[in-house]
Regions:
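UBL (ubiquitin/ubiquitin-like) substrate-recognition surfaces
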Residues: 1-578
Length: 578
């Protein structure tokens, strides 16, 4: 008996099967029935030429050793009730300790206790913690107080985990994030707060009334923490240009670059031969400037890329006004955006809040703010990515539609009464279409099955994904810390409620990640919901809540947005669609 080893992919699992080339399709289906429990009549197996038929000659399918085939179908109700012994011992929630319960899929994340006007810090930390790559890099960080981990564990058992962290700010952040991952309760960030105040005394200022510490600006806390991480988190650069050279993690994943041009506003300076000054700047956030004409984030970002500076002009021999224009030459993977909502007022000696409503998108296209060179690299990739996402959305909608129709047919208790009108419509449409075609042509028409149509769509999406990857310039492909699509998705928001930066209340919103598939390890589609962190209170909110954070009063207004680059598509070539 001649046999060919193939791999059959079904519901995320891969099965190794020996195909008897002397048998037919029905025999092969019974083989798969013994492995998957899906009855032959409920199987849809995609092979060359379409769907595998029962009478197909397996020797004529052109199967190759190691080839992957895709199988669709689920067992009927008779088989779904078969009870199998679980592979792992089941552990119930009441039998788990706090750390195990906190790490369950879908568990509510830990909040942070307010230690006296520390909501500015709590909201900042929750959004920073939403960056998974940062958490991973912090775990690799070793500070001078690395030996404190045992004492930290001991204090944690006494409910004083926040006291056992490192005095180094970066090490303290590492310890805090780790401890937050082991509880669902409001955690006291005592040691991190002490480390923050030691490193930056401005956060240790006392309140003017003498009671406790003063409220602080969350944007200042964000900037100072990021500056410290930039100094401490050093990694090896894997790009070809600077192989193995030390680079800051922040510079690689959260820093962008501007190309700048500065020129004098007075025509006399140009007439006397003064040339424009071209330069390069590094940025760690984009500023959204707000004025009477700012209605959308795009307006504020555009305004923030032009700046007027008064400085000495050598050719004029006096001070003159210069305009500095910036264009982005590098977009980072993680992009913070700061709404410049606070303006210093001399009459009150306070940072007054600009209440104007400024809307912001869930998906940000940053290409319009880039240099012409970067635009040429990103536009083809962005346009093709949008095509791919549209095709994937259409395919997903078609699958859901088919599933609903199938469920409706299976649950229909009176087929004649329920389906007769629809059946008559289908028959009438088929007769009308048949009558409009020549008789000899009608005989040659071959109708495609749903599985064949789906396979063709999947093949089209696969080809489009490959095309996207081919459009990425070598320069961008070598920089894995840069945005390679030009598109961003919103992942976190820090908000402020109140009239000034030194008063009011800060909270944060972080988008929920999709559940992780235990078989493949990949994350499933997200449900679109968000976590709202209000100090130690954590609740789940709908996506519509985020659009209410545009401002327009003293209510919760977005202060910092954290965007993450839309990644390049992943090409799964396990399944042959040819």
């Amino acid at each position: 008996m001649a046999s060919i080893p193939v791999i059959v992919k079904h519901q995320g699992k891969k099965h190794e099967v020996e195909v008897d080339t002397t048998s037919n399709g029905e025999t092969f289906k019974y083989q798969l029935f013994s492995i998957t429990g899906v009855e032959p009549e409920r199987q849809k197996i995609i092979v060359k030429g379409g769907q595998l038929k029962d009478d197909a000659d397996m020797s004529k399918l052109g199967l190759k050793s190691g080839q992957t085939l895709m199988m669709m179908g689920t067992p009927s109700g008779d088989n779904t009730n078969v009870i199998e012994k679980p592979k792992e011992k089941i552990k119930f929630l009441e039998d788990m300790d706090e750390a195990e319960a906190a790490q369950l899929e879908g568990a509510t994340p830990a909040g942070l206790q307010n230690l006296g006007n520390t909501c500015y810090m709590n909201s900042t930390l929750q959004v920073l913690r939403s960056v998974p790559e940062l958490q991973e890099e912090l775990l690799r960080y070793a500070d001078s107080g690395a030996g404190s981990s045992s004492s930290a564990n001991a204090l944690s058992q006494l409910g004083l985990g926040g006291l056992g962290a490192s005095m180094d700010l970066t090490g303290s952040l590492r310890d805090l994030f780790k401890q937050m991952g082991e509880t669902q309760q409001g955690f006291p960030p005592l040691m991190f707060l002490n480390a923050l105040r030691t490193a930056f005394p401005q956060f240790a200022q006392k309140a003017k009334d003498g009671h406790g510490y003063a409220q602080q600006d969350a944007e200042e806390a964000w900037s100072q923490i990021v500056a410290q991480l930039r100094q401490k988190l050093q990694i090896k650069n894997e790009s070809d240009a600077e192989k193995n050279a030390d680079v800051s993690w922040i510079d690689k994943y959260m820093a962008g670059k501007f190309e700048t041009v500065m020129e004098c506003d007075e025509p006399a300076a140009k007439e006397m031969g003064e040339e424009s000054v071209v330069g390069e700047d590094t940025f760690f956030k984009l500023n959204c400037h707000i004025n009477v004409e700012t209605n959308h984030l795009r307006d504020g970002l555009t305004a923030g890329l032009k700046e007027q500076i008064e400085k000495n002009s050598e050719v004029l021999g006096r001070n003159a006004v210069y305009t500095k224009t910036s264009k982005i030459s590098r977009l980072p993977v993680h992009l913070p955006v700061h709404f410049v909502r606070f303006d210093w007022r001399r009459d009150t000696n306070k940072k007054a809040k600009i209440m104007r409503k400024v809307t912001f998108p869930d998906e940000l296209d940053a290409i319009e703010f880039c240099t012409d060179t970067l635009k040429k690299q990103l536009i083809p990739v962005r346009d093709k990515i949008r095509d791919v996402r549209k095709e994937e959305l259409d395919l997903e909608r078609a699958r859901k539609r088919q599933k609903r129709m199938k469920a409706g047919e299976e649950n229909d208790s009176d087929p004649l009464a329920q389906k007769e009108p629809l059946q008559k419509k289908k028959e009438a449409a088929a007769k009308k279409e048949e009558a409009s075609k020549p008789a000899e042509l009608a005989e040659e028409i071959e109708y495609k099955t749903d599985a064949q149509i789906e396979a063709e769509r999947a093949a089209s999406i696969l080809a489009a994904k490959k095309e996207v990857l081919s459009l990425v310039s070598p320069e961008l492909a070598a920089d894995d810390g840069a945005n390679q699509t030009g598109l961003y998705e919103l992942r976190g928001v820090i908000t402020h409620q109140g009239a000034s930066a030194d008063s009011g209340h800060y909270t944060s919103f972080v988008k929920k990640q999709g559940a992780k598939d235990p078989v493949t390890g990949k994350r499933k589609a997200e449900d679109g919901k968000w976590w709202w962190f209000n100090d130690d209170k954590v609740s789940e909110v709908e996506a519509e809540r985020i659009q209410t954070l545009a401002g327009g009063g003293q209510s919760h207004s977005a202060l910092i947005l954290l965007y993450r680059a839309v990644p390049l598509p992943v090409v799964d070539e396990d399944v042959e669609m040819s």
